[in-house]
Structures are given as C-alpha cells and as structure tokens.
From Swiss-Prot:
Protein task: Catalyzes the synthesis of GMP from XMP.
Known pathway: Purine metabolism; GMP biosynthesis; GMP from XMP (L-Gln route): step 1/1
Protein name per UniProt: GMP synthase [glutamine-hydrolyzing] subunit B
Binding site for ATP: 29-35
InterPro entries: GMP_synth_C, GMP_synthase_B, GMPS_ATP_PPase_dom, NAD/GMP_synthase, Rossmann-like_a/b/a_fold
GMPS ATP-PPase domain mapped to chain residues: 2-190
Gene encoding the protein: guaAB
UniProt entry keywords in alphabetical sequence: ATP-binding, GMP biosynthesis, Ligase, Nucleotide-binding, Purine biosynthesis
EC number: 6.3.5.2
UniProt KW Nucleotide-binding keyword: yes
Organism: Saccharolobus solfataricus (strain ATCC 35092 / DSM 1617 / JCM 11322 / P2)
Amino acid sequence: MFDPASFVEEIGPQLRQKLGNEKVLAAVSGGVDSTTAAVLAYNLLGDKVIPVLVDTGFLRKNEAEKIKDYLSNILPNLIIVDKKETFISEIEGIDDAEMKRKRFRELFYSTISSLMKKFNARYLMQGTIAADWVETQGGIKTQHNVLVQIGIDTEKEWGFTLIEPLADLYKNEVRELARYLKLPKEISERQPFPGPGLLVRAVGKLTREKLEVVREANDIVEKYLDPFNYSQYFAVSFESYGNLVNLDGIDAFLYKARATGVKGDVRAYGNIAKIECSNINNVKNIIDTLVKYDITHVLCTLDERNSGKYSVAIRAVTTEDFMTADYVRIPKEILSKISSEILQKIPNVKEVLYDVTSKPPATIEFE
C-alpha cells in the first residue's frame, strides 16, 4: 500500500543529493501529476526550483489564469509563458494522431530548452507517471513527456537532464501524494488532462475552429459532471462526415475521423462508429461485434440537428489505474442537459454523442 509520507522521506535525500545547488525548471501543466512533482521539488529545494506553465493554446477554457490562482500560495514563483500562436500555427493542418503528438513534443521541448538557457537551469523536472511510459513503450500512443524510457537522450537533443520523481507511481498514488502535500483540491482532485491538451481532443486535422468547439464543449461537460467524481470525463470534436454501413446485421455510421485503441497490448488506429441505442447500458454485444471491423470507439447519439459541421462526443470513465477503464452509465437526464446546452451554445455542432467503449478496446483519449 502506498504511503506518501514514506515516499517523501525516501525521495527527498535522493533529490537533494542529485540536484545540489543547481537550478531546476519544473514544467507545470496544471494537471495533478506535473503540479505534484513541482510542489514536491519546491518544498524540498525552495527557490532553486523555477515552475513554468507553457500556454500552448491547447489548455482548457481560462485554464492558465485558474492555475495561477490555485497555486498562488504553494508555487508563488510560477511563471506563465504564452506560446499559443507558435504551437497552433505549427500544428494546424496535421491530421494523424501520432504526428500531432510528436510535433507537439518537438515544440514543447524546444520551448523548454530555450527557457532553461534563459534561467541558467540544468535540470528539468516533470510529472511523468507509470501509465505514461507503459503506453508509450507499448506503442499504444506517444506521451509527449516520455523521453528517457524510449531512448531519447535529452542532454544530446535539448541540453538538459531529466528528473522524474513520480515515474513509478500511478494516478491514484499521485493523488494521495498531492493531498499529503496539501495541494488545493482543485489540483489534487483535478480531471486528468493530456500534456498536448485539447490538441488530442480536436480529433483529426487541427483547425482553429474545431479547437474552439472542443474548448467550449469540454467546459460544458466538466461543469455538469464535476459533482459526480468520475475518474475522467471530457469532450472531443471531429467533423461529422462519413457513411452508413451494415456490419453483421448492425447498422452503423463510420466517420472519416479515426481514433486510437488497444488490441492485445498494441496500438490500434481505427474507425469511430455511431450506432442508434435506446439504452447505453446494453450495448456490449454490439461493441464486441463492431471492434472486429477496425473500430476503436463506438458512440451513441444523444441529440442532433440538421445544421452544423462538427460532432461532439462525451467521454466518461471509471478506473483504478488508467490502464483499463469502463465507460460510465451516466443518468439519461444529465446527458440530455449536457447535449442540449452544447447544441444551444455552439452553433456549428451538428450532433452530440456518448462514447460507450471501455478500455480496451478503446483508449481513454481519442488520440
């Protein structure tokens, strides 16, 4: 059983010995992993730790300002660096999920490298956890913060040495550590958020319009589902284009957009399918059939209209360790409220869907 006090007692001397009087740049995304790593280091080493949040343009609605406010007392020297236009303009137009993640990684660490030179820091601390490197090593999807574990020499590539104090912990253990370190609950209980952020929730080719659709939709989903404390919940958006097919007697709509999944222990990159289902609790047999046909995510229609360009899918799961997960059976009235507000507030959304796929065969995120 994980004991956060023992963990801090053990890792403290290791960090002090390794880092000495060197400056450390701590990359903070606002998520629980990176923030816990930064606070752990700051508590141990003080002002030698320089926490930095890079605003990539892929953060949630008003996120940079919220993070600054949440952390004002525990990371008072947090620096926010605005790189929105750099990231969006460089990745705009890329449609492959892995290419988007890898381009994000290149831009992110080039930015970090420049900041480290500016602050004369030799070490980079980040919040990589066990689930990140397990997925990357397994080829399921590239986690932008997994470097050393896949043979990338950070000294040679970008001129810094990487420190990852949480690399052997899983999400539930990181949350325990965050509570022990007295992080505000807005951080310790915060929704998991991928390093590339909304980039991987704007499924398929990145456009500025799609990015703003998913930013607004995600905000609505979080507002309604926050009280339920599900393990993870969010929205994704993609173009509504596709075609009807019949697979083993099942009518399905296959979108042109594709999404990641897991088959065995390896990555799958397959179709997103929509089915008509009157009861989201009773779709297992349909999903078992469809995943044989290169389908990674199965969605049910919640609400739709004749106009609009984009589909918005709601994703909510329960999980202990994020290595496997089950989709949540959200009450119908809650889903109805969410879908109604999305259609009301975002004019270019054609339909709202609910993801009824567990992990495996789907990954939690779509990209």
